[in-house]
From Swiss-Prot:
Major location (coarse): cytoplasm
Domain spans labelled S1-like: 1-72
Localization of this protein: Cytoplasm
Name of the protein this chain belongs to: Translation initiation factor IF-1
Keywords: Cytoplasm, Initiation factor, Protein biosynthesis, RNA-binding, rRNA-binding
Example of a GO MF term: ribosome binding
GO cellular component: cytosol
Pfam families, per the entry: eIF-1a (PF01176)
Family the UniProt entry places it in: Belongs to the IF-1 family.
Known role: One of the essential components for the initiation of protein synthesis. Stabilizes the binding of IF-2 and IF-3 on the 30S subunit to which N-formylmethionyl-tRNA(fMet) subsequently binds. Helps modulate mRNA selection, yielding the 30S pre-initiation complex (PIC). Upon addition of the 50S ribosomal subunit IF-1, IF-2 and IF-3 are released leaving the mature 70S translation initiation complex.
Quaternary structure (record): Component of the 30S ribosomal translation pre-initiation complex which assembles on the 30S ribosome in the order IF-2 and IF-3, IF-1 and N-formylmethionyl-tRNA(fMet); mRNA recruitment can occur at any time during PIC assembly.
Keyword Mitochondrion in record: no
Stored Gene3D superfamilies: Nucleic acid-binding proteins (2.40.50.140)
Length: 72
């Protein structure tokens, strides 16, 4: 899969799950399961419920995503 095949959308963290997984409510109202990208994990950026984040999603599976940015 090429990098340009991803869908980027903003959302809000609703719930923290085990293994660095999160329930994210997207702007359009859908709720997806998302994990933290390697760069965020590498820099020990904490993500808490209520944080606004950017999520990358594959067009093939719209129920899962990757958190790539946490807004300040």
């Amino acid at each position: 899969m090429a990098k340009d095949d991803v869908i980027e959308i903003e959302g809000t963290i609703k719930e923290t799950l085990p293994n660095a997984m999160f329930k994210v409510e997207l702007e359009n109202g859908h709720e997806i399961l998302a994990h933290v990208s390697g760069k965020i994990r590498m820099h020990y950026i904490r993500i808490l419920p209520g944080d606004k984040v950017t999520v990358e999603m594959s067009p093939y599976d719209l129920t899962k995503g990757r958190i790539t940015y946490r807004f300040k």
